[in-house]
Amino acid sequence: TAEQLKLFRDIVNGAGGQTQNRGAYAVLTANIDLKNEEWTPIGPDRDSAYTGTFDGQGHTVKNLSVTVNVQPGRAGLFGCVKDGTIRKLTVAGSVSCTANQGWCGGIAGYAMDETIENCASLCTVSCTGIDARVGGIVGLVDYNSRTLIIRDCYNIGKITGRSDNGSGDAGGICGFYMNGKISNCYNVGEITGSGYVSKIAVSAYNDSRPTNCYYLSDTDTDLNGTAKTAAEFANGDVLEELKAGQRDNNADPWADECKYLAAAGKTLPVFN
């Protein structure tokens, strides 16, 4: 229930009279409706980053509403995650930050050495302060992160990164990262930013570019992904590529057929 998820958050954050446990283990057993009530992120800052395993079991947290206006802002269902795993989770709602150094993502604002897999964001995500980093799944990956993995994820929400100093980086999956592995993902959401913009992820180094990732466009203009038309998404071409990109250590999460997603207004690959 929503109340149980709030209790879990308070345990991780050490709030509401709870003894802090940043590594608490959680499993969703049903979809959760947060009813657009203002949500304080799980792991609101790097000192309180969530370090455990969160298994969504294919469920959705919907009507998420996050508004952060305190610098530095870390906004998402999770604010900061580190050295843990988030899997099989879909989030829907809105995430925004107006503070400087705002990092925003549907799943998490900030990540370091984390594994995020089989996750989807249907969120509208925006950051408007100086040095904004905003992504569909994760806003910013720590510069010192070495073992981050984002795989088999997708975004269909609108992503906006706007900053007065021109540094509003925005990516469909990740707003900015230097090290780590992003693979087997797709984005069909609209991406805009005043800094660097990528349909998949803004990356600093060529050797850390995303692999086997796809975005919706009639023109192939993004080096960090491969453009596919709406027809190629709908007819199973992208799904076939995603299934072909599976590794032995990661069970295939993708359904055998595409499905019409009302939130996107398109037929797209979905999870089992």
What role is predicted for each listed range?
Residues T1-N272:
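Surface-exposed repetitive/solenoidal architectures
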